[in-house]
């Protein structure tokens, strides 16, 4: 019967690891969604400590620049479709971002962190 207690501990640990990992993920933002020079969605609201993943779409190259937050920015251009940049937000606030090559075309957005 000792193996049942070990099995219970292992199953509980596995469940908690999946649950905690799922809670940290907040949103996926597509860069160049549908071949357009847009972020989709271009506005999201998340909780502090959560992660937003930016995924390069069909129309590269793109980058992500957060005004006043160089530590969150990904200035290198993403050329490969499907390339991802995860960004974790630890402080509440409004974080405006843009794609530098396409900001003039309106490729901008904001993340609200509660």
Positions of predicted regions on the chain:
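Bacterial N-terminal signal peptides
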Residues: 9-19
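Extracytoplasmic copper-binding redox domains, predominantly the cupredoxin/blue-copper superfamily
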Residues: 2, 20-114
């Amino acid at each position: 019967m000792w193996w049942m207690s070990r099995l219970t501990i292992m199953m509980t640990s596995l469940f908690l690891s999946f649950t905690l990992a799922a809670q940290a993920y907040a949103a996926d933002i597509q860069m160049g969604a549908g071949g357009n020079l847009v972020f989709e969605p271009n506005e999201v609201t998340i909780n502090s400590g959560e992660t937003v993943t930016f995924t390069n779409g069909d129309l590269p190259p793109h980058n992500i620049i957060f005004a006043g937050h160089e530590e969150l920015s990904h200035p290198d251009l993403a050329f490969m479709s499907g390339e991802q940049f995860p960004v974790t937000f630890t402080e509440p606030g409004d974080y405006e971002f843009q794609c530098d090559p396409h900001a003039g075309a309106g490729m901008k957005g904001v993340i609200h962190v509660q």
